[in-house]
Amino acid sequence: MNIKSIKDLDLKPGNSVFIRCDFNVPLDEYGNITDDRRIREALPTIRYCLDNDCKIVLGSHLGRPKGFDEKYSLKPVAKRLHTLLKQDIIMAQDVVGEDAKAKFTKLQPGEILLLENLRFEPGETKNDEEFAKKLSQFGEFYVNDAFGVSHRAHASVEAITRFYDQDHKAAGFLLLKEIKYLYKILENPTRPFMAIVGGSKVSGKLGALINLLPKVDKLIIGGAMAFTFLKALGYEVGKSLVEDDLIEEAKNILNQAKNNGVKLYLPVDFVVAPELDPNAPVKYVTFQEIPKTWMGLDIGPASTRLFKEALDEVQTIIWNGPMGVFEIDKFARGSIKLANFVAESFATKIIGGGDTASLISKAGVVDEMTFISTGGGASLELLEGKELPGIKALEVGAS
């Protein structure tokens, strides 16, 4: 994968740079940002352009608006950027309209213009070339620092790159870091290499499991997806979530792991309840004792001990997907315990974005991880071995 870094660009004072960021941050009901990690991760690239005395234009989406909708405005992001960078952020009232153009014309070196939510324009998600061309007029240089949307062929990620030659487009520091940890480690991990795969559905992680199997030495399968595997082994799992149409696939994965000499671990006990409810009664049972009308909602203490032993001597860990319904405290213990055990490991620890990143934050072990991806869907597609359109568009030789 041959991709230009922002450091390879010949940036001169006064040059304009359009940076595609990923400011898709969670907001509470009052429009306050509840987690600004994605904004903070974009700062090194923005600061690099400031140090080079460039005129900076930032573009991002937020949520999935259908046309203009004030609650998806990037104004809270402008406010947070102002706090973090300690400088004024010029906020455009539109994306490629009169206000954005007028403000861009007046932009001075060292100033930052933030465009309004890119998805207010229907052309963004359609990868529309006309819209991409309008966006490209906001920068002599184009930098993609939005790993979280690089798996989508959208106008600000893919089509826009057609308007820049090889010397005028590059990856920002965050995108390069994501590629380094997720892509390069998969290619050449320090062994023993373990993958921890959780979450609710096998269907969502099937591609990743198939791609990881030939690469890993150990594999932990947890979360609700474990029940499809237990059923494939002939066990009854009560009312737990099972994808019956994937039982054959689960059998294939179990056989392939055996043939490849991969040590595969499944939970041996669960926290079960009659329904998914914070007030439901719970009990701990082994995997052979799940009552007919109850469902497993977290892994039990014997499973966390087993997984802790499995972590012994491992040198590289990739984790994607929680072990239970960690959003509800009584079903979060297994995931949090495992997060603590992973934190104590001396291995290189890479966390896929999305739910797993939220879990690591809830467990309070963010600083103990080597790298936490900012993209849930994008990191999963890399684990599946797929090419991401936004990264492919930056490869030297791509037109």
Curated annotation (Swiss-Prot):
It catalyses: (2R)-3-phosphoglycerate + ATP = (2R)-3-phospho-glyceroyl phosphate + ADP. Keywords: ATP-binding, Cytoplasm, Glycolysis, Kinase, Nucleotide-binding, Transferase. GO terms for biological process: gluconeogenesis; glycolytic process. Substrate binds at residues 22-24, 38, 61-64, 119, 152. GO terms for cellular component: cytosol. It holds the Pfam family PGK. The lineage of its organism: Bacteria, Pseudomonadati, Campylobacterota, Epsilonproteobacteria, Nautiliales. Pathway: Carbohydrate degradation; glycolysis; pyruvate from D-glyceraldehyde 3-phosphate: step 2/5. Its main location: cytoplasm. ATP binds at residues 205, 296, 327, 353-356. The gene is pgk. It is an enzyme of class 2 (transferase). PANTHER family: PHOSPHOGLYCERATE KINASE, PHOSPHOGLYCERATE KINASE 1, CHLOROPLASTIC-RELATED. Belongs to the phosphoglycerate kinase family. This is Phosphoglycerate kinase. One of its GO terms (molecular function) is ADP binding. Monomer. Its EC number is 2.7.2.3. It is found in: Cytoplasm. InterPro entries: Phosphoglycerate_kinase, Phosphoglycerate_kinase_N, Phosphoglycerate_kinase_sf.
